[in-house]
């Protein structure tokens, strides 16, 4: 937070460090809420949706990205390799069994919470949101020529981006 304050010391910005599950902002206090790659680390998505909905103004927008449920389903988040060491296929198992998954990320053991696409979509709908966009990003065509291993990223979705509007 010190670095953020240093980069943008505007008195109009209030920097806080709190767990997402504990945030409690005043109703109708934001026009937009953006979250990047966070919710697969939280057990409950429904609670987040309810709280974000409350703090958004009418017609406010909620935009977020998560690791795609196909990516988080199996847990170890790695390919199954063939006898030559090349990716043979991506394991998708226990997809409908939501809950704790253990993975290695940047050399660290991390705990994630797998959720189905249904959970993300219905969590938004139950909170009162109208989904306006849903995207499963793919590598740009130019990357496929310059970074050959990116071709494997066309074999399964890794990320999910959703935008929703408060009704």
Question: Which residues are covered by each model-predicted region?
Answer:
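A short acidic, Gly/Pro-enriched loop at the edge of an enzyme's catalytic core
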Residues: 21-32
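Conserved class I S-adenosyl-L-methionine
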Residues: 61-99
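A short glycine-rich, Lys/Arg-flanked "PGG" loop and its adjoining helix->strand segment in the class I
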Residues: 46-61
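Short alpha-helix
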Residues: 99-100, 111-134
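Conserved SAM-binding loop
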Residues: 4-5
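A short SAM/SAH-binding and catalytic strip from SAM-dependent methyltransferases
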Residues: 31-46
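Core SAM-dependent methyltransferase catalytic element
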Residues: 127-129, 147-167
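Conserved SAM-binding strand-loop segment of SAM-dependent methyltransferases
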Residues: 9-22
């Amino acid at each position: 937070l010190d670095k953020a304050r240093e980069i943008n010391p505007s008195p109009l910005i209030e920097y806080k460090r709190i767990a997402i599950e504990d945030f409690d902002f005043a109703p109708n206090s934001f026009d937009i809420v953006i979250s990047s790659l966070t919710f697969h680390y939280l057990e409950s998505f429904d609670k987040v949706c309810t709280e974000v909905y409350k703090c958004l103004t009418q017609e406010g927008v909620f935009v977020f990205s998560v690791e795609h449920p196909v990516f988080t389903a199996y847990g170890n988040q790695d390919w199954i390799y063939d006898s030559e060491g090349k990716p043979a296929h991506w394991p998708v198992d226990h997809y409908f069994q939501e809950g704790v998954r253990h993975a290695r990320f940047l050399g660290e053991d991390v705990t994630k919470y797998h959720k189905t696409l249904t959970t993300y979509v219905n969590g938004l709908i139950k909170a009162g949101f109208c989904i306006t966009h849903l995207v499963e990003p793919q590598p740009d065509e130019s990357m496929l020529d310059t970074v050959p291993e990116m071709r494997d990223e066309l074999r399964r979705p890794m990320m999910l981006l959703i935008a929703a509007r408060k009704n």
